[in-house]
Amino acid sequence: MLHFLSSSSPLNPQFLLLPRQSARLRVLLSIPVSAMSSSSSSSSRGALAAAAVPSLSADEAGAAADEAFLRYTSPSMRRSGGGGVAIVWFRNDLRVLDNEAVVRAWAASDAVLPVYCVDPRISAGSTHYFGFPKTGALRAQFLIECLEDLKRNLTKQGLDLLIRHGKPEDILPSIAKAVTAHTVYAHKETCSEELLVEHLVRKGLEQVVIPQGGASNQKKPRNPKLQLIWGATLYHVDDLPFSVNNLPDVYTQFRKAVESKSSVRNCSKLPPSLGPPPGSGLDEIGGWGTVPTLESLGLSMTKAEKGMHFVGGESAALGRVHEYFWKKDQLKVYKETRNGMLGPDYSTKFSPWLASGSLSPRYICEEVKRYEKQRIANDSTYWVLFELIWRDYFRFISAKYGNSIFHLGGPRNVESKWSQDQALFESWRDGRTGYPLIDANMKELLATGFMSNRGRQIVCSFLVRDMGIDWRMGAEWFETCLLDYDPASNYGNWTYGAGVGNDPREDRYFSIPKQAKTYDPDGEYVAYWLPELRSIAKERRNFPGASYIKQVVPLKFDGGHQKRDQQFNRQRRPGHMYRRQK
């Protein structure tokens, strides 16, 4: 994910021609998870209610956001005198705080026009290989909330958000012409579909002619320019101690190099006001437009009765940082709790806002440093930064290897035989594998759009190691469901887990019995998502035998966990054996 796009790399065909949707899958994504569970409503009584993340009220989150904005506002900032109109094209950077594209546009203009394009290839498109919906209802709703909050925060800063439904390469040139914009500012993306859109926008802007004031022999007409800015990572690409092409393939080597030889740039400051918007041209293009609804996107959703409900938007993101770091004081124990699976506070839960760009990784870093000065610095405070560096690593790896992170063989072009058995995959997708730890995690994903880091590793290992299913099916299903989906992290992690990425231990295997005993010893997590297990003794909830549905495959035997896996497999009902299709 950077400016390296191989001409031989295949692009998703929907970016050339929008494909037909899978009606069955889109209906599936509109069904509340409770309707997909075999348990009765009476068996779920007593379950913990859904928890909002953050748990702050809207007023509390807004106050935390206002305080953050105040700390990063500089009354001394002045425009550089560039004049004219600049457009800010919002993409995966749905925030005002530490948004360099916004600040650069403000500084270089007399008026700023923020624009967001609801691209049908994203909102209604299909995944490349298996045709799953590209955006499920849960993430769509989260993004809608992000747009609503972005619009509010821009209004507080003297602007507004112009929203259009359509392809950016069609919309932005027409808007630039209407408001006579000299530049479109946006944050740089790095994967092929996003890079193609950047290319098409640039070509479209080249066809727009903006007349200049004054005598014709003094000022020639010009074309609006596309100015792309790096701003999605903790470490800026220009500050790496190596070129992207020479990026270390092993995370530890990458981390040690950037920690010792690079520094994190400061968050950008804000002026007291980002206004005004353009004074003319908006009527010509139909006004500001409206934030989409699920219905307008052809989606529907029933509010989940349990699990976590993430609130979209920059204000909620800043509220969550305040809540987790300062109000609940959880940062100091993050490393000890991060492998949990149940509840909102075992980890930061920042990832959905990072993925949408509602939260800046540099802001998190500066808050960690502030916490270390005011409260405590320990392994836990460092570990939050450690995880942000992982996020950087996958983005830079995708920049280095381009589309290979989406290919079956991954960056290392590993040749392996994989099954694409649809029935077997659907048992994994729907949480019907017969292994409670797998099924509980998959039901959480369906209900909330979220899954713990530990859970993701376990269900990935099960799909690719125990089931032998094509890892891309899992990656594309995660693309559909995850609130925190971004291509670099999602596909980077899946290639890593499938043994086709940059993991030195390419045969990495997560034993379900070992994981269950270590991370859910009392079966609280599986009983929460699988209410039929609540009546079983705690020590047997992850190993329920005939009390639970039949296991669809035996576990892979590996030397380290063979005895445990044999014990687990003996609970299978006799006479059932899965044979992988050739």
UniProtKB/Swiss-Prot annotation:
Give disulfide pairs as residue numbers: none
Q: How is the cofactor bound?
A: Binds 1 FAD per subunit.
Q: Which UniProt keywords apply?
A: Chloroplast, Chromophore, DNA-binding, FAD, Flavoprotein, Mitochondrion, Plastid, Transit peptide
Report the transit peptide positions.
1-49
Chain ranges of the Photolyase/cryptochrome alpha/beta domain: 84-234
Q: Which organism is it from?
A: Oryza sativa subsp. japonica (Rice)
Compartment list: Plastid, Chloroplast; Mitochondrion
By its UniProt entry, which Gene3D superfamilies does this protein fall under? 1.25.40.80, DNA Cyclobutane Dipyrimidine Photolyase, subunit A, domain 3, HUPs
Report the protein name in the record.
Cryptochrome DASH, chloroplastic/mitochondrial
Biological process, per Gene Ontology = photoreactive repair
Q: Where in this protein does the record put region Disordered?
A: 560-582
Q: Which Pfam families match?
A: DNA_photolyase, FAD_binding_7
Q: Which NCBIfam families match?
A: crypto_DASH
Which Gene Ontology molecular function entries are recorded, alphabetically?
deoxyribodipyrimidine photo-lyase activity; DNA binding; FAD binding
InterPro entries named among the record's database cross-references: Cry_DASH, Crypto/Photolyase_FAD-like_sf, Crypto/Photolyase_N_sf, Cryptochr/Photolyase_FAD-bd, Cryptochrome/DNA_photolyase_1, DNA_photolyase_N, Rossmann-like_a/b/a_fold
Q: Where is the composition biased (Basic residues)?
A: 570-582
